[in-house]
Design a protein with these regions (language model features):
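Bacterial Sec-dependent N-terminal signal peptides
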Residues: 1-31
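Thiol-/selenol-based redox modules, centered on thioredoxin-like
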Residues: 360-406
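Surface-exposed beta-loop interaction hotspot
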Residues: 110-145, 238-245
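Short active-site neighborhood of thiol/selenol oxidoreductases, capturing the structured segment around
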Residues: 263-294
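Central antiparallel beta-sheet cores of small beta-barrel/beta-sandwich binding domains
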Residues: 27-95, 127-128, 135-203
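Structural micro-motif
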Residues: 332-336, 355-365
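Structural microenvironment flanking redox-active thiols in thiol-disulfide oxidoreductases
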Residues: 289-332, 344-351
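N-terminal "domain-start" segment that seeds a small globular fold
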Residues: 230-267
Length: 406
């Protein structure tokens, strides 16, 4: 090959290498607008790329009053893999300088996840007007959720409004929806929430009698909702939704942990103690919030109180044990945790045959020193609910002291 031709070939090769490296440079640091796509519905959320190297990226996912810090996102070529906190899900992304696209994947599900996209330096509701809002939704609203099957459930919406901006949470009798943020535009409202497990879009418009709209949960599924202003409305207290008579029933600990050979609760260690049993799942954000509360409570837990957790997971037992071990390590949980079985409230209820039902994950079952079930906290109001979260702590600790003093 002639010398000039060799030189030209070398220059072309170097140019391609430079262009290739530029194309797969690290994601741009700064604020991004992410979105999960459900068919023609988009669930937006904010995140920030804090720091990026050749192999790792640090991100911060932001949702109203909540943040999820991620310091172990992995770079591989033009792909970015973002594990979503302690949950077994991740964003699988291909990126250019100012755009990302990919999939939101839950590792315990075989089907492909919803589409994910992101754009650099864009507000999460950038396609909406930011004029002054003529309609107000601040304070508390009684919400009715209507399922496609015909089922109806009640909820309480707590809203804070600053001009067009909305911060909110929605409480139900199976747990709260955690942190929403959004906007009011003229007579319409739109709010979103993304926590790594759920991506919710709450959208509607104002009518003469109140608000009406849809709450989108996942591809192909939504519930209609209606909201009426009611500043005295309350849900049933979580400690009163399901009750039991003192001395009426005991937990079946062998059934509780599915009788696994290496997964057995030592009941001798519980004798003469107040026992708190948390029924939970590593896939559940409400369980995550309650577990954080219990971790902190255990720092000053009395010696005559025992705390245990029993988890109900998707997939087989091998997966469940692996998930629970990782979850316990990541969260530095100081109390014993056991695999209870597959993800089923019916399965969880088998260990408590005299109780009407297990209403939700998480559920707390409180057992007195004689071994009888005394109290059941049937759902959890997490930190997004403000005063209701503080009220849970007060009521929980009051019942602990009552059982200790018997």
């Amino acid at each position: 090959m002639p010398t000039k031709a060799k030189l030209r070939f070398l220059l072309i090769t170097i140019s391609f290498e430079i262009l290739f490296k530029a194309a797969i440079s690290q994601p741009i640091e700064g604020k991004w607008r992410g979105a999960i796509h459900y068919d023609n519905i988009e669930v937006p959320f904010a995140f920030e790329v804090l720091k990026s190297t050749d192999s790792l990226t640090e991100l911060l996912i932001i949702s109203s009053g909540d943040t999820m810090e991620i310091n172990n996102a992995r770079l591989k070529g033009d792909s970015l893999f973002v594990p979503l906190g302690v949950f077994d899900s991740e964003l699988r992304i291909r990126y250019t300088n100012a755009e990302m696209s990919g999939e939101w994947h839950k590792n315990y599900q075989q089907l492909p996840g919803p589409l994910f996209t992101a754009t650099y330096k864009q507000d999460i509701f950038s396609n909406h007007s930011v004029s002054m809002a003529p309609v107000e939704i601040e304070d508390r609203w009684r919400i009715t959720l209507m399922q496609p099957s015909g089922g109806i459930s009640k909820a309480l919406g707590l809203f804070e409004q600053h001009e067009n901006q909305i911060a909110s949470t929605i409480l139900t009798e199976v747990g709260d929806y955690r942190y929403f943020e959004g906007m009011i535009m003229n007579d319409s409202i739109v709010m979103s929430s993304f926590d790594g497990v759920h991506a919710f879009l709450f959208a509607g418009s104002y009518h003469v009698t109140g608000w009406k709209g849809r709450l989108y949960y996942e591809p192909g599924y939504y519930e209609n909702w209606e909201a009426m202003y009611d500043n005295t409305y309350e849900l049933t207290d979580p400690f009163e939704l399901i009750t039991t008579e003192p001395g009426a029933s005991r937990p079946y600990y062998d059934i509780l942990t599915a009788g696994g050979k290496y997964n057995i609760i030592n009941t001798d260690s519980l004798a003469g103690k107040v026992v708190v049993i948390q029924l939970m799942g590593t896939w559940c954000p409400n369980s995550f919030d309650q577990t954080n509360y219990l971790i902190n409570w255990c720092k000053s837990k009395p010696e005559d109180v025992k705390m245990i957790a029993v988890s109900y997971e998707p997939g087989d037992k091998s997966y469940a044990h692996q998930r629970l071990e990782k979850y316990k390590k990541q969260m530095k949980i100081p109390y014993p945790m056991y695999v209870g079985g597959s993800l089923s409230k019916g399965q969880a209820a088998l260990a408590f045959p005299t109780i009407d039902r297990i209403n939700a994950f998480p559920t707390l079952v409180m057992v007195d020193k004689k071994g009888f079930i005394r109290y059941i906290c049937s759902y959890f109001n997490g930190p997004a609910t403000g005063d209701y979260y503080l009220q849970f702590g007060t009521e929980f600790e009051k019942r602990i002291e009552e059982l200790r003093n018997e």
